[in-house]
Curated annotation (Swiss-Prot):
SUPFAM superfamilies to which the protein is assigned, alphabetical: Metallo-hydrolase/oxidoreductase
NCBIfam families: PRK00685.1 (NF001911)
Pfam families, per the entry: Lactamase_B_3 (PF13483)
Keyword Ubl conjugation: no
The UniProt record lists the keyword Oxidoreductase: no
InterPro entries: Metallo-B-lactamas, RibonucZ/Hydroxyglut_hydro, UPF0173, UPF0173_UPF0282_UlaG_hydrolase
The protein's name: UPF0173 metal-dependent hydrolase Msm_0779
SMART domains to which the protein is assigned, alphabetical: Lactamase_B (SM00849)
Keyword set, alphabetical order: Hydrolase
MF terms (GO), sorted A to Z: hydrolase activity
Similarity comment: Belongs to the UPF0173 family.
Amino acid sequence: MEIRWLGHSAFEIITDEGLNILIDPFISNNPACQIPVEEFNPDIILVTHGHSDHLGDAMELSNKNNVPVAAIHEISLFLSKQGINNIGVNIGGSFIYRGVKFTMLDAKHSSVLDIVEEPLPAGDAASFLITLEDGTKLFHAGDTGLFGDMKTIIGEIYKPDIALLPIGDKFTMGPFEAALATRWIDSKVAIPMHYNTFPPIEQDPSIYANFVSQLNPNIDVVILNPGEYFEYNPENYQD
C-alpha cells in the first residue's frame, strides 16, 4: 500500500489491488499541496467533516471521476442536493466498496458546512478506519482532540496498523496529546498530519516523534513532506 501525504489532512492511498482512496481532499486551496487537482483520479473519496479545509475539492473530483464521496449522513444529504454521488454512513457503521471495508468512527471536533454563505449543520466530526483485503488497517483520525475511546475502542478493538494523526494544536491535538493518542492506539506506524499548513498550526514534527519514542519506542513515526509517499509492507512490521 502506498500512502501519499498531500499536506494538511489530505492523503492519497493506493492499495496493492490498485484502489485509489482520497481522504479529506483539500488540494486546490491548500498552500502545502503543489499538485494540481486535475492530476487526481480517485476511485472513492472520504470526508471526515464539513469544514472547507477537509471537504476541499471533493465535489469537483467526484463529478470529474464519477466516484462516490463517503461522509456522515448530514453531509451526504447536502451532497445529494448538489447532485453528487455519495455514500452516507454514521458513527460505528461500515460499508464495503470494491473489496475494501470502510468504518466510520468517532472524533472530537466541531463540524459545519462552511462552503456556503450561511453555514449549515454537518453532523458530527468523524474518523475512518480502512480495512484492506489482506487485513491491513489504516486509521485516519480526522480533526480531533484526545479522547479515551482512542484506547478502549480504536486501539483495543479495531487495532489499526497505521494511524494518521493531527498534531497542529489550537484546532486539534498538539504534539504531546497526539503522542498519547499514538500510544493508546498502538499502531505499528504513525504519520503526523494537520500541521504547518497555516501559521496557527505550525509545528516541528520531530517533537511529536520524540514524545512517541519516549512513550512507546516500538512505534515507527514516519514524517513525510507534502507530496511524499510511504510504502507500507506488512512483512516489515511483523510482531
